[in-house]
From Swiss-Prot:
It is found in: Membrane. Residues 322-361 form the UBA domain. Coiled coil: none annotated. It is a multi-pass membrane protein. InterPro entries: Peptidase_S54_rhomboid_dom, Rhomboid-like_sf, UBA, UBA-like_sf. Keywords: Membrane, Transmembrane, Transmembrane helix. Its main location: membrane. This is Rhomboid domain-containing protein 3. The chain crosses the membrane at residues 13-33, 58-78, 95-115, 146-166, 168-188. One of its GO terms (biological process) is negative regulation of natural killer cell activation. Pfam families: Rhomboid, UBA. Residues 238-264 are annotated as: Disordered. GO terms for molecular function: serine-type endopeptidase activity.
Amino acid sequence: MHAWEAPGSLSRALPLASSVLMLLLSCLWLLGAGPSLRLAPELLMEPWQVHRLLTHALGHTALPGLLLSLLLLPTLGWWQECHLGTVRFLHNSTVLALATGLLAVLLAGLGVSGAAGGCGYMPVHLAMLAGQSHHPGWPQRTLPPWLLPWLLLALTLLLSSEPPFLQLLCGLLTGLAYAAGAFQWLELSEQRLQVLQEGVLCKSLARCWPLRLFPTPGSLGELPVTYPAGVRPATPRPPYLASSDSWPHSDGSAQLPPRLGPGQLTWKNSERGLDWAGSSFASATTMWAALDEQMLQEGIQASLLDVSVQGSQSSLWLPKPSVSSLRLQQLQHMGFPTEQAAVALAATGRVEGAVSLLVEGLVDTEALVTEGRSSPAHCTGTGAS
């Protein structure tokens, strides 16, 4: 799967924020707007110049610095946006750019020469890399993750003279502080993130092509993945370890309940059902909620298997009042067959539970939804695929 392909997407789409940022940096360079965005402490006293604390990252005055920033956006920025989500990626980038500007101005005010006066996006790249390289989902390479930001800092100093060294160092230190939890109070909560992603604008951008808004993996607004009939991934993806903050400075870690080993939790079998419920494994409370959902899924599967064992001894028929037409239409719009959707709804009574059964391929029943109670519809049985 390519880095810019969202799970379950039918066509390739580029991450929206990183791609638009590349266009913006290029346009500002062509317009010669770099000097007017320079982080100059002497100009920040004017009210209309405060924007430089944030917009200093968008301007460039040296071509090597611009090319290096543009090169890192598709190689590093796309990966970060796909794994953080577009909204959280924009939020983290904005917070780190502003914090870097404030730290540079503070050092310049203390008399440290060269701490400010430059511009460029490289300090934000360093800050994002320093914070994201400690994330559990970061690809394991030969080099240790903590060494990557320092190598990028040395490479930037060799290839470009912009921004100044101290401004680059401010960006790297800001990222390390972010990874340590210094900005945890500025993090987007899961509720606020869900509200933003469920807005009309975000929903519209999530359907766009070739630039697409990526939802935060594991968030409540992310629907489970559906595959066409007969198409299944070779190896299931591990569930996302979602938490209130995507970077690893949470206070606690998930623990298993007493007398329950990790082998008893079939996370792979119920992966998409847990994703639909938006379960978060970052605390013990959410772990118990996930366990309750897991036990419910196992009970539903056992009840369906009991129906398949009876076979020809009893026939399955679904009266129409037992199946909600609105919920059935929702499943039909997702692309599920009507007969299987009706059986899953009758077994669970909830759309999310029915989606979980259908996605896992546990419903293989041909049933008919009847108008009354007098004409039963025979089925071929239910079993695990």
